[in-house]
Amino acid sequence: MSDNDTNVKQWKVRRLIATLEAARGNGTSMISLVIKPKDEISRISKMLADEYGTASNIKSRVNRLSVLSAITSTQQRLKLYNRTPQNGLVVYCGTLITEDGKEKKVNIDFEPFKPINTSLYLCDNKFHVDALKELLETDDKFGFIIVDGNGALYGVVQGSSREVLLRFNVDLPKKHGRGGQSALRFARLRMEKRHNYLRKVAETATTMFITNDQVNVAALILAGSADFKNELAQSDIFDQRLASKILKIVDVSYGGDNGFNQAIELSSDALQNVKFVQEKKLITKFFDEVAQDTGKYVYGINETLQALEMGAIELLIVWENLETKRMVVKNPSTGEEKVFLNSPTEQHDESKFKDPETGAELDVIEILPLTEWLVNTYQNYGAQLEFVTNKSQEGNQFQKGFGGFGGILRYKVDFQDYAVVEDDLDEFI
């Protein structure tokens, strides 16, 4: 799964968590079911059948019927699966109470975007989402290269585990004390061996950290006791895909395993903040386009959506808590459909639901958060979608100064050549 896919899937889970946490029901009619990857559907089905029998004895008629209904819905969801999916299965079923006091049935089932390590069955007056929150905890893999004048070590750190992938030693000639021609010759030989050593370090790094033309770690840490690490980072022979993933360069007192351990310790803060760093890099890339006035950038909801529909956007950047809604309405007389983009203050504007010419009531076809619509459709336009927070200085500036909505273009677009379809929103144009 690419970093981009993971970013979008994590946003979906965060959104789902917020929705589920806010939901409340009467009695114990809300079922949370989490099944581990290798657990048997048949075992869970039997457990639900037993639970159904137990719930049949609940004294309160209203609560009994609600619980039995939730168990039945859960059983129906399980019938959609012959076996537990590769990453496990999450099911939420039940009847919740809406803000206006009405009952609403909720039935959700999905395979998580990565293996889930929890088993859970709870029938309560709320949904339990701790297992989903665990999915959002980082399990990124970080690559380490420890390089000095004695050799190189390649390792990875993932969570609390570390692994040495490869190590090799080198015997580089020391500086020679002779003068004249001998000194020049030895200096040349020493530089040649040093260059060959760095080439081997760089080529081995490509072998270790690139799989199927994709970097297989979230970030790289270079460490060492001499200048080798800096030379490697700046060298043309170091794969640029890896160079772009360098998170930190640290000085360590040792090589080998001791150097690896020291490098992990010295880079711990950077590893914890890697998503923060990735976000800063992403937004800085957008700011650079703006500062250089390349014309290959866009911001503001209307122009950005125009560019998206034209297929001109390469990278779409969206603040994760954007509150804009996308509303599709239809004139029942003419059949004409129209799209409105509404800010939170405009979402109860009754004029949007009436034909401006005839005053006729318009039918609402769809109301979706714009973020949700983008998640469902961005791939149709060949764009990459990245959600960002406003927790970094760059993220905060992007949200406040650019409306939290913009993109980097594949090519320049002159928006004056295109009619603005909707200008109801977009104070950032």
UniProtKB/Swiss-Prot annotation:
Gene3D superfamilies: 3.30.1330.30, eRF1 domain 1, eRF1 domain 2. The gene is erf1. Directs the termination of nascent peptide synthesis (translation) in response to the termination codons UAA, UAG and UGA. Keywords: Cytoplasm, Protein biosynthesis. It is found in: Cytoplasm. One of its GO terms (cellular component) is cytoplasm. GO terms for molecular function: translation release factor activity. Belongs to the eukaryotic release factor 1 family. Heterodimer of two subunits, one of which binds GTP. Its main location: cytoplasm. NCBIfam families: aRF1_eRF1. Signal peptide: none annotated. PANTHER family: PEPTIDE CHAIN RELEASE FACTOR SUBUNIT 1. Pfam families: eRF1_1, eRF1_2, eRF1_3. This is Eukaryotic peptide chain release factor subunit 1. The keyword Cytoplasm applies.
